[in-house]
């Protein structure tokens, strides 16, 4: 049975939660492998909306075990609140399995994240202020605190004190902030130790054993390809590897265990925060997309920047991630447009290119070259097969397939769990 990666092909907020939830009924393990509570997933079940920041979307399926891999950075307060909130709404979820090697977000990581963004001013990255970047920085600098450290109080306190010896110097002398008490930080972390102890496991062994036994393992990426720290629009990126390859390093399974890679793409494009965005619309069309698409961040509540579908952006992600199937979301938002532009190339200082440029300088100068496709006016929210879609809508999907270089296997035609068109089975 397969290992399946679900990952975003644009700049996040593509609707990965919807696709994951759709597949989760047939999944044994649903794994988050990167990022932290800077991500936001929305799943609509009936009349209820569920917002999750840390737990994988598959947690709403009682037959699927949620897993937080070593590539995730954990805010234990957020994890506890999220679990309690879901249970408070009557969702009977087991506690997720947690990698002993996952790193912990502390209050000083969050403080550093916020004051650094303020200090940068107009040069800011546009982070969520959740402490994600500073936590990954400590991980790379070998100063991080891991989940397993919770179970050795002496080690934990030593690590917190050593880290704050340095960070308090920065906070006090550079940012003019008060020093953070290492004892308070350690006490706050240790308060979670006994609650999570039963769920801390060797995630790599659990997942590999499951795959050996024929279980279905779904790896749910946070953020998206173009926010990847290596392949994204650097420096306007996240601090981890949400690309498909990150599923291996962030959970402990080898690349040969991955059988299918499902890329998620909106039928148009959005972005939150700073960074280049060639097809961005700063006019009434952009406001219409934002309004009709409900484009406000789950985590930050910030209005998302909106623009037309950029085939070069998605094609790049399809290539680097070896995407086998594309799930196209929010196609219904485009209903009612007489003509729909699709970016098929860039004009960079008078030169035409049909692929994403190598340098960020060129991307910042890129002007979109559009192809115009006929729109449709029919309501598509009740479509459940590809043939149910209007002819022009079908033509739009087929043209996107040609441009990005992979097949569209699923389409979101509304916010609800059942408002989807499945063209090709995403698991078998």
UniProtKB/Swiss-Prot annotation:
Catalysis performed (reactions): IMP + L-aspartate + GTP = N(6)-(1,2-dicarboxyethyl)-AMP + GDP + phosphate + 2 H(+)
Listed GO CC annotations: cytoplasm
Amino acids binding IMP: 13-16, 38-41, 128, 142, 223, 238, 302
EC number: 6.3.4.4
Binding site for substrate: 298-304
EC top class, as a word: ligase
Keywords: Cytoplasm, GTP-binding, Ligase, Magnesium, Metal-binding, Nucleotide-binding, Purine biosynthesis
Any Pfam family the entry gives: Adenylsucc_synt
InterPro entries: Adenylosuccin_syn_GTP-bd (IPR018220), Adenylosuccin_syn_Lys_AS (IPR033128), Adenylosuccinate_synth_dom1 (IPR042109), Adenylosuccinate_synth_dom2 (IPR042110), Adenylosuccinate_synth_dom3 (IPR042111), Adenylosuccinate_synthetase (IPR001114), P-loop_NTPase (IPR027417)
Function field: Plays an important role in the de novo pathway of purine nucleotide biosynthesis. Catalyzes the first committed step in the biosynthesis of AMP from IMP.
Catalytic site: 13 (proton acceptor), 41 (proton donor)
The protein's assembly and partners: Homodimer.
GO molecular function: adenylosuccinate synthase activity; GTP binding; magnesium ion binding
Co-factor binding details: Binds 1 Mg(2+) ion per subunit.
SMART domains according to UniProt: Adenylsucc_synt
Cofactor annotation: Mg(2+)
This protein's name: Adenylosuccinate synthetase
NCBIfam families in the record: PRK01117.1, purA
Domain of life: Bacteria
Subcellular locations according to the entry: Cytoplasm
Biochemical pathway: Purine metabolism; AMP biosynthesis via de novo pathway; AMP from IMP: step 1/2
Binding locations of Mg(2+): 13, 40
Listed GO biological process terms: 'de novo' AMP biosynthetic process; IMP metabolic process
Claim: Cytoplasm is one of the keywords in the record: yes
Protein family per UniProt: Belongs to the adenylosuccinate synthetase family.
């Amino acid at each position: 049975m397969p290992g399946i990666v679900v990952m975003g092909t644009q700049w996040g907020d593509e609707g990965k939660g919807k696709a994951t939830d759709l597949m989760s009924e047939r999944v044994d393990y649903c794994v988050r492998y990167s990022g932290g509570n800077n991500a936001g997933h929305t799943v609509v079940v009936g009349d209820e909306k569920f917002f999750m920041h840390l737990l994988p979307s598959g947690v709403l399926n009682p037959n699927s075990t949620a897993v937080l891999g070593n590539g995730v950075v954990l805010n234990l307060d957020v994890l506890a609140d999220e679990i309690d909130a879901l249970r408070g709404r009557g969702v009977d979820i087991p506690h997720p399995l947690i990698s002993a090697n996952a790193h912990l977000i502390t209050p000083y990581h969050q403080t550093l994240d916020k004051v650094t963004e303020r200090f940068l001013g107009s040069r800011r990255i546009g982070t969520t202020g959740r402490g994600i970047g500073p936590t990954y920085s400590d991980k790379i600098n070998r100063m991080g605190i891991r989940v397993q450290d919770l179970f050795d109080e002496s080690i934990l306190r030593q690590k917190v004190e050593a880290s704050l010896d340095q960070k308090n110097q920065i906070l006090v002398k550079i940012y003019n902030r008060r020093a953070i008490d290492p004892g308070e930080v350690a006490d706050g972390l240790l308060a979670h130790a006994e609650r999570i102890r039963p769920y801390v496991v060797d995630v790599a062994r659990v997942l590999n054993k499951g795959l050996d036994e024929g279980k279905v393992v779904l790896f749910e990426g946070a953020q998206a390809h173009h926010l990847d720290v290596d392949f994204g629009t650097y420096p306007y990126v996240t601090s981890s590897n949400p690309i498909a390859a990150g599923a291996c390093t962030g959970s402990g399974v080898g690349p040969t265990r991955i059988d299918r890679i499902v890329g998620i793409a909106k039928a148009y494009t959005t972005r939150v925060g700073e960074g280049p965005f060639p097809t961005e619309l700063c006019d009434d069309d952009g406001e219409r997309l934002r309004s009709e698409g409900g484009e406000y961040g789950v985590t930050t509540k910030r209005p998302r920047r909106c623009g037309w579908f950029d085939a070069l952006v998605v094609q790049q992600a399809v290539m680097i991630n070896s995407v086998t199937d594309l799930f196209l979301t929010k196609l219904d938002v485009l209903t009612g447009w007489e003509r729909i532009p699709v970016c098929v190339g860039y004009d960079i200082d008078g030169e035409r290119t049909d692929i994403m440029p190598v340098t960020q300088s060129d991307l910042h100068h890129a002007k979109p070259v559009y192809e115009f496709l006929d729109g449709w006016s029919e309501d598509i929210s009740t479509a459940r097969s590809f043939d149910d879609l209007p002819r022009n809508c079908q033509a739009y999907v087929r043209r996107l397939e040609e441009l990005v270089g992979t097949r569209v296997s699923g389409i979101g035609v509304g916010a609800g769990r059942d408002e989807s068109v499945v063209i090709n089975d995403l698991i078998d």
